[in-house]
Design a protein with these regions (language model features):
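Soluble "head" domains of membrane/secretory-pathway proteins
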Residues: 2-8, 24, 28, 42, ...
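Hydrophobic membrane-insertion alpha-helices, especially the h-region
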Residues: 13-28
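Signal peptide cleavage region of secreted peptide precursors
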Residues: 29-36, 40
Length: 185
């Protein structure tokens, strides 16, 4: 009888430890998210299931072109790409990103840009000053984010600059559907 009781206690302990580990991992390290909508096409598709790395920004800062998940509202998280960092002046002119006056390539958009006719624009011209807040440069602890599908994305052009403390984490790994399994550039 005692042996059977000890086995049950061992199983209960193991399950409690596993549950605690799962909660710690989910809350502090990694979380699943599902892409909702077309705002990150062609990079991410509606329904892509991804893993959010929450740990990356506990020890570091976002980098230009990171794909991040952030709290857009109390109940809704968005997935967008970091375009502008603290201290940057951002401008788009003729589908070219300028950071502090220097043109910067966006290789993840090249396929879409190549398909445009001469009189079409993929990213409408704007300057940082055109965004809510009328900033000359992005202030400390904020980033400017855009969706890769520039004509169909609710991003910093509408939401304003995103405080870094609202960023949940970085996402680069699709685990479902299986035909899209892998890392995203």
């Amino acid at each position: 009888m005692t042996k059977r009781r000890n086995e049950w206690l061992d199983w209960i302990k193991a399950l409690i430890v596993a549950a605690i580990l799962a909660i710690v991992i989910r809350v502090f390290l990694f979380a699943p998210i599902v892409v909702d909508g077309p705002s990150m096409l062609p990079t991410l598709e509606n329904g892509d299931h991804m893993i959010v790395n929450k740990f990356s920004y506990l020890v570091g800062e976002p980098s230009r072109f990171d794909i991040v998940v952030f709290h857009a509202t109390e109940t809704k998280d968005y997935i967008k790409r970091v375009i502008g960092l603290p201290g940057d002046h951002i401008e788009y002119k003729d589908d070219t990103l300028y950071v502090n006056g220097d043109p910067i390539e966006e290789p993840f958009l090249q396929e879409r840009l190549d398909r445009l006719s001469e009189n079409q624009s993929y990213t409408f011209d704007f300057r940082l000053q055109d965004i809510k807040g009328n900033y000359k440069t992005i202030p400390e602890n904020h980033v400017l984010v855009l969706g890769d599908n520039r004509n169909n994305s609710t991003d910093s052009r509408m939401l304003g600059l995103i405080p870094i403390d609202r960023i949940v984490g970085e996402t680069r790994f699709i685990y479902w559907p299986m035909e899209r399994f892998g890392f995203v550039d």
